[in-house]
Amino acid sequence: MHATSSDDFSLSSRVALVTGAGRGIGRGIALALARAGADVAVADLDPQVAEETAAAIRSLGRRSLALGVDVSDGDSVRAMVERVATEFGRLDVAVNNAGVISIRKVAELSLADWDRVMNVNARGVFLCCQAELPLMQAQRWGRIVNLSSIAGKVGLPDLAHYCASKFAVIGFSNALAKEVARDGLTVNALCPGIVGTGMWRGEDGLSGRWRQAGESEAQSWERHQASLLPQGEAQTVEDMGQLVVYLACAPHVTGQAIAVDGGFSL
């Protein structure tokens, strides 16, 4: 039996790209990859927050590059990947994390709301994968992790459009995994649960919007953890980063949609 060692989860000499890495889950994943030894390109719609993450990665002794990108725009995505290839000479791990959310009932949902969520969350994953694949296939090694959600496994009220985009990511990732399985690539979807980032926290987050009468946002946050999660506590960005590091090192895990959700989707 092979004994697990820290070397099994080393990404030394690997180059990673994380979109939506300026804050929240994307930032946590980028830092986890850097701590595992990877050099990390950090992309975000806001170049300033991307640079803040890149600076944190450099402080860990790894190389980093901050990039601005609109993942719903093909030219912007292709330019991002070309810049990574120019700066680092390769691309080994791609985490297509950039995403948006809005909270609307279907009866109130505008076509603009639908298009915005689908264009970033689903079209963006497609465009990123399409641009990343040639580099990985040329070197016959690559790991792609696309961000879905528990909302890609379970329908949630007021989030039908968001659920549609995240269900799409799972189906796309599963199909792509089969297409590239003989090329030395793996493709998986990560499905975060309830994480204390901007999607959930704050007056405009889900815990703010789903408050009961007389309840504060903080009280709503605690109630949702207690009522929705069998474990009773929220997940962290570090939880997501740990799984991505594992997937980046695992040669035979592919086509999976893995929930890190404290049992929410059971």
Name what the model sees in each region.
Residues C129, S165, S173:
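Active-site helix of classical SDR
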Residues S149:
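Residue(s) in the substrate-gating loop at a strand-loop-helix junction
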Residues K105-V106, D113-D115, I144, W210, ...:
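Substrate-binding pocket helix/loop in short-chain dehydrogenase/reductase
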Residues A79-T86, R104-E108, A112-N119:
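Active-site Tyr-X3-Lys motif and surrounding loop/helix of classical short-chain dehydrogenase/reductase
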Residues F126, W141, E233-V260:
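C-terminal substrate-recognition "lid" of short-chain dehydrogenase/reductases
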Residues P134, K178-E179:
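Alpha-helical segment proximal to the catalytic Tyr-Lys
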Residues A181, T186, V253-G255:
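Short, small/polar-rich loop/turn modules that mediate ligand/substrate recognition or access, typified
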